[in-house]
Regions:
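Non-transmembrane "mature" sequence context
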Residues: 1-127
Length: 127
């Protein structure tokens, strides 16, 4: 949804946080969707993807998927972060960064179905 793509340095820093990535064809295969539907999900904010500057392939953090489907809380949480003027790069960095006050990473809370606390925090962020 956010057209700005990370530089090599930014992507490598994000890669260190995210760890495991998946691609559009892999998501399509695991969900039984056609790949154009996965592209639509990235366009409408259901998923977030970044172009890897090393090979030009668009990648999605694997933890954005559970049981082969996008986690339900991701789209709304990304909307809150974007409304607070976070870029997708900043938002995903925040989601994958340890927060001792939680404790843990915001993405772990979203995956556990605990979106209210994460969205509350996202609304009050001062990046």
């Amino acid at each position: 949804m956010n057209p700005a793509q990370p530089t090599l340095e930014q992507f490598e820093a994000l890669d260190a946080l995210v760890g495991e990535w998946t691609t559009f064809p892999d998501v399509a295969e695991s969900t039984g969707m056609i790949v154009t539907r996965v592209h639509s999900m990235a366009e409408d904010g259901t998923l977030v993807a970044f172009r890897d500057p090393r090979d030009g392939v668009r990648r999605i953090p694997a933890e954005f998927l559970m049981d082969g489907h996008p986690i339900d809380a991701l789209r709304g949480t990304m909307t809150v972060l974007r409304d607070n003027l976070y870029t997708d790069l900043e938002a995903v960095t925040w989601l994958f960064t340890e927060d001792e006050s939680l404790p843990g990473r915001p993405i772990d809370f979203l995956r556990a179905g605990r979106k209210a606390e994460i969205r509350r925090r996202a609304q009050t962020l001062d990046w």
